[in-house]
């Protein structure tokens, strides 16, 4: 394939990637967006395989077969509720790919056309060192995020004295090693840089609590994009640079939007220490010296069947219990009774960007019934019932009333303004932010203690 034809194919693939991002921004066009991304990637892979510089086809076919087999198994086995940790795992692979490509270029620069051993082009040294640093941070940070999301590591922040000064010192040392390697091509500086970047990725993510996981996933997505762009520079592949820049910039923009939705700066999230695990009070009982009103599935069924407008607020509890299908079934029963049903989604509900949207889409919930915070918040005051299923911190009125609360200033869903709040929860445990939800003790709140899926199924049975 000629160079001109290769560049033309890369441009087509790049345009398809941009259109894919545009399509994925809306649930109704997400399938088409996915298809365009797949076609773009197919064009990119075929074009690269037809490049004159590609010779070891046997190794490439073997790698594709192994990767394809693993991907097929993952697609069939992994549940929709496990998508956040799957995304984190994929980010780690991109980071490690950047590390391996940079290392391969250092050890065999002739194969990459960037010079010879001891005489690598200055620009390539800078590209390699940046790709290595970002890739290593992405890898170790994503591994920690995966561990937290999978429950292998405690979701609460892990902090220790002088943590931030240590990170600052390591950051400065990282920059120094970058400069030293770029100036001297020292293998010692390179591998020291690699170890330091791995350590920094670990130290940056370990103090971040579960409440910030959606932002962390988005941030790591951005890192993986820049790592891919670094690989593109090392390999001299313009499409990889374009794709990496698209992922990196979109991830950064999404991180900013989500931080804005939490009324927090990205620097607060990176510094960590927010999102501790809360204690547990007895289900159906009192938290401290305050009591709550507990109800049954029959109570909830009676209240909702006699309502005219119900707003459903899904959260991480729905994801854990895999209650999305039972929830849609309940909504269908309500609609048959003439009840107006809609869904309210908080931008940081769940453990990754769009987590609730993905689960509701899997349950075939109509897109026109799903609304973001800004679109639906004013509707709670006219709703007869707000049905909250495992959405804790994002419904806590303390975010508006208690300046001492760690979530103070975070925009919340105004569920307390509904006529009745039905709140499904396993116990009186606080959310990932580690603060008690004042909503539990409101006069118009009825707690429904139990597994979200089982409770919803019992409500459906009671309605029938």
Swiss-Prot record:
Known EC number: 7.1.1.1
Cellular localisation: Cell inner membrane
Any one GO molecular-function label of the UniProt entry: proton-translocating NAD(P)+ transhydrogenase activity
Bilayer disposition of the protein: Multi-pass membrane protein
Chain sites annotated for binding NADP(+): 316-317, 348-353, 390-394, 425-432, 451-452
Segments crossing the lipid bilayer: 54-74, 86-106, 126-146, 164-184, 191-211, 227-247
Domain of life: Bacteria
Catalytic activity as recorded in UniProt: NAD(+) + NADPH + H(+)(in) = NADH + NADP(+) + H(+)(out)
Enzyme class, spelled out: translocase
GO cellular component, as recorded: plasma membrane
InterPro entries to which the protein is assigned, alphabetical: DHS-like_NAD/FAD-binding_dom, NADH_DH_b, PNTB-like
Subunit structure: Complex of an alpha and a beta chain; in Rhodospirillum, the alpha chain seems to be made of two subunits.
Family, per entry: Belongs to the PNT beta subunit family.
Function comment: The transhydrogenation between NADH and NADP is coupled to respiration and ATP hydrolysis and functions as a proton pump across the membrane.
Name under which the protein is recorded: NAD(P) transhydrogenase subunit beta
Biological classification of the source: Bacteria, Pseudomonadati, Pseudomonadota, Alphaproteobacteria, Rhodospirillales
């Amino acid at each position: 394939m000629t160079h001109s034809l290769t560049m033309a194919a890369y441009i087509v693939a790049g345009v398809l990637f941009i259109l894919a991002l545009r399509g994925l921004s809306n649930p109704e066009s997400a399938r088409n967006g996915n298809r365009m991304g797949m076609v773009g990637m197919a064009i990119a892979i075929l074009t690269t395989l037809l490049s004159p510089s590609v010779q070891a086809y046997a190794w490439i076919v073997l790698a594709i077969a192994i990767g394809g087999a693993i991907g097929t198994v993952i697609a069939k086995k992994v549940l929709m509720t496990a998508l956040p940790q799957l995304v984190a795992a994929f980010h780690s692979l991109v980071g490690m790919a950047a590390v391996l490509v940079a290392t391969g270029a250092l050890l065999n620069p002739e194969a990459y056309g960037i010079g010879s051993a001891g005489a690598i082009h200055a620009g390539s040294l800078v590209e390699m060192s940046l790709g290595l640093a970002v890739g290593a941070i992405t890898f170790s940070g994503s591994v920690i995020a995966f561990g937290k999301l999978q429950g292998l590591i405690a979701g609460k922040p892990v902090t220790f004295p002088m943590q931030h000064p240590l990170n600052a010192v390591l950051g400065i040392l990282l920059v120094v090693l970058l400069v030293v390697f770029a100036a001297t091509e020292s293998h010692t500086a390179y591998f020291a840089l690699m170890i330091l970047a791995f350590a920094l990725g670990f130290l940056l993510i370990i103090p971040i609590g579960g409440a910030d996981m959606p932002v962390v996933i988005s941030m790591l997505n951005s890192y993986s994009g820049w790592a891919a762009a670094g690989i593109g520079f090392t390999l001299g592949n313009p499409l990889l640079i374009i794709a990496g820049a698209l992922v990196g910039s979109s991830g950064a923009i999404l991180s900013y939007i989500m931080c804005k939705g939490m009324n927090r700066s990205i620097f607060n999230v990176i510094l960590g220490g927010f999102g501790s695990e809360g204690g547990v009070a007895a289900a159906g009982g009192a938290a401290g010296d305050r009591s709550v009103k507990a109800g049954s599935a029959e109570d909830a069924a009676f209240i909702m069947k006699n309502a005219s407008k119900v707003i459903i607020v899904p959260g991480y509890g729905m994801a854990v219990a895999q209650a999305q299908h039972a929830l849609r079934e309940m909504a269908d029963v309500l609609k048959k009774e003439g009840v107006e049903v809609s869904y309210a989604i908080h931008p940081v509900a769940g453990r990754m960007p769009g987590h609730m949207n993905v689960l509701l889409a899997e349950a075939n919930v109509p897109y026109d019934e799903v609304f973001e915070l800004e679109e639906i918040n004013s509707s709670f005051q006219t709703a007869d019932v707000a049905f909250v299923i495992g959405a804790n911190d994002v419904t806590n009125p303390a975010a508006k009333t208690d300046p001492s609360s760690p979530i103070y200033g975070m925009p919340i869903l105004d569920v307390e303004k509904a006529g009745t709040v039905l709140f499904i929860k396993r116990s009186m445990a606080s959310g990932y932010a580690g603060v008690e939800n004042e909503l539990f003790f409101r006069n118009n709140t009825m707690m429904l203690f139990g597994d979200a899926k089982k409770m919803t199924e019992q409500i459906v049975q009671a309605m029938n």
